Amino acid sequence: MMKKSIINTLIFTSIATFPLYTLAQTKLTELQVATIVNNTLTPLLEKQGIPGMAVAVFYDGKPQFFNYGMADIKAGRPVTENTLFELGSVSKTFTGVAGEYAMQTGIMNLNDPVTEYAPELTGSQWKDVKMLHLATYTAGGLPLQLPDSVTDQKSLWQYYQQWQPQWAPGVMRNYSNASIGLFGALAVKRSQLTFENYMKEYVFQPLKLDHTFITIPESMQSNYAWGYKDGQPVRVTLGMLGEEAYGVKSTSQDMVRFMQANMDPESLPAGNDKLKEAIIASQSRYFQAGDMFQGLGWEMYSWPINPQGVIADSGNDIALKPRKVEALVPAQPAVRASWVHKTGATNGFGAYIVFIPEEKVGIVMLANKNYPNPVRVQAAYDILQALR
């Protein structure tokens, strides 16, 4: 049986048999929310063979936490809302906010050519590539991953210098760690801080994300979950630009706080004006591919969504393939009637975050197994639809 940090008497017949539209007509109790979450996720966990998952649901102005299974099978350590999970590409949402903060504070401009921040790139293929293109995977075909031969700064710049685009900038979206990773590194370059320290000082600490890290300190190692692949424990090893593209670890408690800040930036305390503007700007609609709008890190769909379209878009057969995009010039400001989301994975972890600002609901799902994105999106949609 999956371990849960909630009462096991959640499923009682009178609630479970109500149709979802009946539940949504009045404000739900915590027990009703828990029933919806458990009825959706318990079968998913079993079917996907997921050892552990930490879930946070934001509803009725507050978070509710649900913890399942094991963070460390061998040690018998259960998942809690303080368990650290690898976020994989959900990290890109932090990089997006950090990049927009650099823009707000004047150390980077999205419309600048990349070469203004990387004089190492003297090849003619770079002359029309802007920072915005790197941030939105539209530079012209940078690959999903850097090659294994890139192991240090010298080989990194050699790689980018010899890279040849397949398309003109701003025409095709090709999801790429090599693209947004370089963006993150260059966006903070003029701060004179490392990317990790910049993120700590200007994003993590102001948002009070005290259990969110790129490098997990020794004092927090006991909270770090093991990921599992083929039943074996695994953890990520960050390669070049890994910090910027997939390097953040966090808890469900911190991630729901991060989600709240992104869902309602106006609620941030006074004195955080530039960070507030950065968060809002990260949800700007810069490019459109089908029904999907590309922000900085975040991907958005106009609400209400076509769920099957969003679910299909999340699968690797679409998400990782080149897609023709339309540049939105000027970028469309953040739209509150949006499904704002991001998936993420490492070899042993699978993460998902989604929220609907207009509806003031959202969910974070952190698992220590990489399982298919469409399964995550379907489950989150089912839960959020039942909460409305």
Curated annotation (Swiss-Prot):
GO terms for cellular component: outer membrane-bounded periplasmic space. Substrate binds at residues 342-344. GO terms for biological process: antibiotic catabolic process; response to antibiotic. It comes from the Bacteria. Pfam families: Beta-lactamase. Keywords: Antibiotic resistance, Hydrolase, Periplasm, Signal. Its EC number is 3.5.2.6. It catalyses: a beta-lactam + H2O = a substituted beta-amino acid. Residues 1-24 form the signal peptide. PROSITE patterns: BETA_LACTAMASE_C (PS00336). This protein is a serine beta-lactamase with a substrate specificity for cephalosporins. NCBIfam families: bla_class_C. The class C beta-lactamase family has a specific amino-acid numbering system known as SANC, for structural alignment-based numbering of class C beta-lactamases, or else the simpler name structural position. A multiple sequence alignment was used to derive a consensus sequence and then the consensus was numbered taking into account insertions and deletions. This allows use of identical numbers, e.g. for active site residues, despite differences in protein length. This is Beta-lactamase. It comes from Yersinia enterocolitica. The gene is ampC.
